[in-house]
């Protein structure tokens, strides 16, 4: 168990105590509706699964941010997946699935995939930035649609923001991890150590990991600390080369992720 739980502050939505103020309550509900994303499923996937929700799967892999999403696109999704849902935050957006997938790919926004070689694995790319105040609502929406047995979260942060008393620990594009109590897999390489205080995990990745800890769900977060402010090959490859956890540990064939 990592001692880093409690490193972040998570802003849960406040409940109203004044039930007499109906107008203010209505405004609050409208605001919450704007904060929640919407899943638009493909017609074929909806037909296959029927009205069965949440969708059960062995593993949910979340790529939060452009570096993690690009890594999943290159090493995980290329030719081995079908897009099953688009995740949108703008309620005015066109709800046609094919239109959304085409435009979301161009804008590198959020897509939910099902692996064709193992349809028990779901992969969600969340390339666009999710504001801090929306993290809780995104988390609730994700787990209202998907019920995984295990969760793997990939995300990134600037290396300049990592604090350590050991300068040798700060290497170019290094990976650290954080896990819930229920996570028991030894899937990380020997050089992958836990994120230590006073470092923090923020935003959607923190919200998802907190949810998994609360509900005793096995989950691990892999954070790539990158030198570049832009997505580059070195940062993307860090997930593959420096976090050599096995696909078999996530329900896939043997080999490196």
UniProtKB/Swiss-Prot annotation:
Gene Ontology molecular function: proteasome binding
Biological process according to GO: proteasome core complex assembly
Domain of life from the UniProt record: Eukaryota
The keyword Protein biosynthesis is assigned to this record: no
InterPro entries: Proteasome_assmbl_chp_1
Keywords: Chaperone
Family to which the UniProt record says this protein belongs: Belongs to the PSMG1 family.
Quaternary structure (record): Forms a heterodimer with psmg2.
Role played: Chaperone protein which promotes assembly of the 20S proteasome as part of a heterodimer with psmg2.
Full protein name: Proteasome assembly chaperone 1
Origin organism lineage: Eukaryota, Metazoa, Cnidaria, Anthozoa, Hexacorallia
Gene designation per UniProt: psmg1
């Amino acid at each position: 168990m990592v001692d880093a739980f409690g490193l972040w502050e998570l802003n849960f939505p406040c409940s109203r105590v004044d039930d007499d103020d109906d107008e203010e309550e209505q405004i609050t509900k409208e605001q919450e509706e704007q904060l929640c994303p919407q899943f638009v499923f493909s017609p074929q996937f909806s037909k296959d699964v029927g009205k069965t929700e949440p969708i059960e799967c062995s593993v949910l892999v979340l790529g939060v941010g452009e570096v993690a999403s690009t890594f999943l696109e290159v090493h995980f999704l290329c030719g081995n997946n079908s897009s099953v849902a688009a995740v949108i935050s703008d309620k005015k957006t066109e709800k046609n699935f094919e239109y959304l997938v085409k435009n979301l790919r161009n804008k590198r926004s959020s897509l939910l995939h099902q692996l064709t070689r193992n349809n028990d694995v779901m992969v969600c790319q969340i390339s666009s930035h999710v504001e801090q105040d929306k993290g809780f609502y995104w988390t609730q929406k994700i787990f209202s649609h998907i019920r995984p047995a295990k969760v793997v979260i990939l995300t990134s942060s600037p290396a300049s923001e990592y604090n350590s008393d050991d300068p040798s620990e700060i290497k170019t594009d290094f990976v650290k991890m954080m896990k819930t109590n229920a996570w028991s897999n030894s899937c990380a390489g020997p050089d992958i150590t836990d994120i230590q205080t006073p470092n923090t995990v923020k935003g959607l990745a923190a919200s998802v990991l907190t949810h998994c800890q609360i509900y005793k769900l096995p989950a691990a977060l892999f954070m790539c600390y990158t030198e570049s402010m832009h997505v580059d090959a070195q940062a993307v490859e860090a997930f593959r080369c420096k976090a050599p956890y096995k696909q078999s540990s996530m329900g896939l064939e043997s080999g490196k992720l």
